[in-house]
Structure formats: C-alpha cells, structure tokens
Regions:
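Single conserved hydrophobic/aromatic residue that forms the stacking wall/gate
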Residues: 1-7, 12, 291-300
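Metallo-beta-lactamase
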Residues: 3, 8-9, 13-77, 108-179, 261-283, 287, ...
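Divalent metal-coordination and catalytic microenvironments
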Residues: 41, 51, 88, 142, ...
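Active-site metal-binding loops of divalent metal-dependent hydrolases
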Residues: 52-54, 89, 147-148, 179-181, ...
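Acidic/histidine-rich helix-loop elements
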Residues: 54-70, 150-156, 209-221
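Active-site metal-binding motif and surrounding structural segment of the metallo-beta-lactamase
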Residues: 62-111, 195-201
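Cap/insert and terminal regions of metallo-dependent hydrolase folds
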Residues: 83, 108-110, 114-117, 182-280
Length: 300
C-alpha cells in the first residue's frame, strides 16, 4: 500500500492543478496525458483523443487489471472532441464502456480494419489499412502505419482485426502516436519514408512477463524503455514522449521503473533531457508549431 501511494504521488498531478492547467491552455495548442495511452492533443481547430480508457479496470466487465492511478479528467470534463484515434482492440486501449458513454459521437473516428462494428452509434467511422491516409482539414492529415503488435479480445479472434500507429501531420509537422509495439526493422523503413518525426509518443512499460515469457526484461510486443528510445532514433524523431506506464499494472516490473530507465538511458540514444520527455498523468503542455516548440517537462 505504501509503495502504491508513493508511486501514485510521483506520477500524477494534483487534480485541482490539472483542471487549472487545462483551463489555462484550452485556447492554445496542447498535449495532455490523461493516463496510459489516452492523450488529448489540440492542433488548431481539431481536438484529438487517443485510445480513451476511463474504466476502473482494463478487461471485460469487472475483470482485468485495476487502475493504479485515476484518469486525469473524467469523461464529462473532456472538451469537445473532433477526432478519435484507436490503435488496436486490446482491453487497455479499446474500452467498450468508454466507447458507449463517450459524449462526442459526432467525432471523426479513425481505427484499424474490422473494428468499425464497435462504433455503431457514431456518425463518422473510418476503418484504415496500413498506409491509408485521411485528410481532416487543410492543415491536418493522418496516416495509419504498421506496428509490431497483435490483436485479440476473445478466444477465437486472434489477429482477426488490424492494429497500427497513427502519424499526425499538422502544417507539415509530424507527431507519431504509437500503437503498443515491439522492436522491428519496420521502424527504420518508416523513418526513411516519413522521417524526420517531430514528436513520437511511445509505450515504455509492460515488458516484464517472466516466467510466463522467457525474458525478465523483454517483450515481443511491448518495448522496454531502451527499445522505445531505439525506435524513436530509427524514426529520426526529434523528441520522444514515454507513455503506457503508471496507470495499469500489466506486468511485473516496478511501477516507476519505466520512467526512470527512460530518462537514465536517453543520452545513450542521442536524446538530451529535454528531448526524452516524461509527463505526469494530468500534465498538459502548450505546443507552438510556429517555432516548432514541442513540449518540455519538469525534471524527474
């Protein structure tokens, strides 16, 4: 219990400060971490949400891992959402309770092939294959790209639906929001074709499944912090922001380990401390694309 309390204080902002900071930035472009893989990203007139999960557990009904930290905002506190991005169908990313209760069903939804059936009450649902591109407006387009991952929600549907990364191109600047991913040569190819990337948001947690998996420090489908940094480097990413840690306990590494390893090893992959970013849950940072000023964070 003590470990949990200390960890929670280290990775989440005080709720009153979250609301205050969010309100102060609501007319600006920003990136904010709600928790796990859920981000709010405002770019011009478009507010984006990624892999929204607001339930108390990541699993069917009341089952699955419980939240270690609460979402930074409640569903009814969200701003109007214009674009809903879903990377894949695992329970800690595709949360049916959130999808049913989501208040902005007029938002444009972009999601992998074969997942549109879960969004029957939504007005604008777009299934995407790898390398599909959708123009949102004159300033913003989104491309769906491969990731080293898999899909499954039941005993009989393994890899029956697609999964992937989203490349957000806003006024010529690029943010790559990653699906859960492992290491693969595909990232060198993507770096050559789409790089340089201005900001990559990558999973850095859920990598120790030993003894269920043969290695204590590696997962085929989830990068550890060092592997995430190597992917960012292969993508020619100028900055990299670690996610997918501190929210649900999905694996056996200590809850705060991903954050520390990510920061400790950044320089080994060519990233300065203000280029390898860690947010607290509930942290919102302004984004200026005029001078390409991407987020910086407090020292950790």
């Amino acid at each position: 219990i003590i470990r949990g309390l200390v960890g929670s204080e280290m990775c989440i902002r005080d709720r009153s400060n979250v609301i205050k900071e969010f309100n102060s930035l609501k007319n600006d472009d920003y990136i904010g971490w709600i928790g796990h893989a859920t981000f709010l990203i405002k770019l011009g007139e478009t507010t984006i949400i990624t892999d929204p999960v607001f339930s108390k557990n990541a699993g069917p009904l009341i089952f699955g891992p419980k939240r270690f930290t609460e979402p930074a905002l409640n569903l009814d506190e969200l701003p109007e959402i214009n674009l809903f991005l879903l990377t894949h169908n695992h329970y800690d990313h595709q949360d049916m309770s959130t999808i049913r209760k989501f208040p902005y069903k007029q938002a444009k939804v972009m999601l992998p092939l074969k997942l549109g059936k879960y969004f029957k009450r939504y007005k604008d649902v777009n299934e995407m294959d790898w390398y599909d591109e959708i123009t949102v407006n004159n300033d913003l387009k989104v491309t769906f790209l491969p990731a080293v991952h898999w899909s499954k929600r039941s005993l009989t549907d393994t890899n029956k639906t697609l999964w992937g990364n989203f490349l957000i191109n806003y006024k010529g600047k690029k943010i790559l929001f990653a699906c859960d991913t492992g290491v693969g040569n595909i990232y060198k190819d993507l770096g050559e074709k789409y790089g340089p990337i201005d900001l990559t948001i990558l999973n850095i947690g859920a990598y120790n499944f030993y003894p269920m998996a043969p290695y204590k420090d590696k997962s085929t489908y989830h990068t550890n912090p060092e592997e995430a940094l190597s992917i960012a480097r292969n993508l020619k990413s100028k900055k990299v922001l670690g996610m997918h840690w501190g929210t649900f306990v999905l694996s056996l590494e200590p809850i705060m380990e991903p954050r520390q390893r990510f920061k400790d090893n950044a320089q080994n992959y060519g990233y300065k401390s203000d280029e390898a970013l860690i947010f607290k849950i509930g942290e919102f940072q302004s984004v200026s694309y005029t001078h390409l000023t991407l987020p910086t964070t407090e020292a950790v």
